[in-house]
Amino acid sequence: MSTSKLQVEEIRERIRTLRIEKGYSQDYMAVMLNISQNAYHKLEKGYTRIHLEKFIDIAKILEIEFPELLNGPDYVYVFSGKYKK
């Protein structure tokens, strides 16, 4: 399964949107991820790659399930037994 550049950009935008909705600053996210604010900024803007482990950590900080981070809130997924519409 390949992830296109557009899909990655959508995920990054979803991360940014959720972060702002929760009222979290980039500084807060960086502290929670144990990285610098500059490093977090680069992750969110797409200047550096986000590794799978960081995606999982970001989902936890944002208090959402990992598949929802990747696919959005309307995604139907079976893995956790949840159905979202």
Q: Where does each model-flagged region fall?
A:
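Residue-level detection of the helix-turn-helix DNA-binding "recognition helix"
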Residues: 20, 34, 45-47, 74
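Residues that mark the N-terminal boundary/hinge immediately upstream of a DNA-recognition element
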Residues: 14, 25, 51-54, 65
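A short, Lys/Arg-rich alpha-helix, primarily the initiator
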Residues: 1-21
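Short, basic-rich loop-to-helix N-cap that marks the start of a DNA-contacting helix
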Residues: 47-60
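Short, charged recognition helix plus adjacent turn
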Residues: 1-2, 60, 70-85
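Short alpha-helical DNA-recognition segment
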Residues: 23-42
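Alpha-helical residues within the helix-turn-helix
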Residues: 20, 31, 60
